[in-house]
Amino acid sequence: MSNVIVVGCGRVGSQLANMLSDNGNNVCCIDKNADAFANLGRNFNGSTVQGVGFDEDVLIRAGVEECDVLAAVTQLDNTNLMCAEVANHLFGVPHVISRLYNPDHERAYMQLGIDYVCGTSLVAEDVFSKIVSGHGSHIDTFGEFEVLRFTLDLSRR
């Protein structure tokens, strides 16, 4: 079981928080808008903290000092970048992952050594793969390695 902080409680953040919580992790969601916590639903077992995700006091209230993983998944690249940097450099969170909205910012994230997921690129690559090959789709990239999904039609033997 891990202690996880999810910054941003929109569609992605709330779904991620619920998935992590349902998987037995201790999850705390941070969002500047208290109304966003309604996205978590009634069955969410974690905690919530209202505030800005890169504010030190907010992170401390969320349990950053015992945190194993922080996922910054707001819709703002600069906010996610700041959250990742504060969690990593000020608090030494072992694993920090950031959502990247604009693929043009990818180089900056790479230069800073921040793990990121770019939904825009993932969707574009997935659609491209389906158009070009019709057989496989890109799931994720981890450094030099890619995870791919393939569908096999065994009836065409």
Give the label of every model feature segment:
Residues 1-157:
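Cytosolic regulatory regions of ion transport systems
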